[in-house]
A protein has these predicted regions:
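A short hydrophobic/aromatic micro-motif that marks alpha-helical segments and, especially, helix-coil
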Residues: 19, 79, 180-182
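Conserved beta-strand -> loop -> alpha-helix junction used to position metal-binding or nucleic-acid-contacting
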Residues: 40-86
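Hydrophobic positions within alpha-helical membrane elements
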Residues: 9, 49, 69, 172-173
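RNase H-like nuclease fold core
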Residues: 1-40, 47, 51, 55, ...
Length: 201
């Protein structure tokens, strides 16, 4: 699904077996060939997608980044380090890039020793990082930082910092689909395309 936040209409609705980076590239290229001017892209941070459009500003949805952190650290983390990183991630939608990067740097300086703790497997003698989920959360933030505040660097484009507009459309569609559980696959796809055609406003 490719959706225009300015006109609030679906530009492309496709059924695909696998969501691939190449498919996204093809769809964006097809839109450009039709004369559609793509000022920016807001996406959920699918691996490999963020760096795929070098000539188009790409914003990663900040709410999706928060979800990634919560998935790694859970909603009720126990250690001070995980609690602090989760709390920091929750500020993403209301902070600036400079403030967030400074806070993340302070977090690392405070908890680097904990983050880098290693444990030894008594059977094999091999060591591994003790706090793997915390490292995954921290590395996710570091890896995605170049795209989390694109909206701030291009104020003239008024880029949304989340995909909430599209998520809201999906939510309404799913509610209607639940009322039509008996639809066959082909009918369901037509229903989805028709839904976005009628709800493009």
């Amino acid at each position: 699904m490719l959706y225009d936040v300015i006109s609030k209409r679906a530009l492309s609705v496709l059924e695909v077996k696998n969501e691939t980076i190449e498919r996204y590239r093809q769809e964006v290229a097809a839109l450009q060939e039709r004369g559609v001017v793509i000022q920016s892209i807001i996406c959920d941070g699918k691996s490999g997608l963020l760096g795929s459009f070098l000539d188009i500003p790409v914003q990663m949805c900040q709410f999706h980044q928060i979800k990634i952190i919560v998935r790694h650290l859970t909603r009720k983390p126990k250690s001070p380090a995980t609690q602090a990183l989760r709390a920091l991630s929750l500020t993403l939608t209301e902070t600036t890039q400079a403030a967030f990067e400074a806070a993340l740097k302070r977090w690392y300086e405070q908890y680097a020793a904990f983050l880098n703790e290693r444990s030894v497997n008594e059977k094999t003698g091999h060591s591994h990082y003790t706090h793997k989920r915390l490292r995954a959360a921290y590395n996710s933030l570091k890896r995605h930082l170049p795209w989390l505040f694109t909206c701030e660097r291009f104020p003239e484009l008024c880029i949304p910092n989340t995909t909430n507009l599209l998520e809201g459309k999906f939510s309404g569609m799913k509610q209607l689909l639940r009322c039509h559980r008996g639809l066959k696959k082909g009918s369901k796809l037509r229903f989805i395309k028709d839904y976005f055609a009628k709800n493009s406003s």
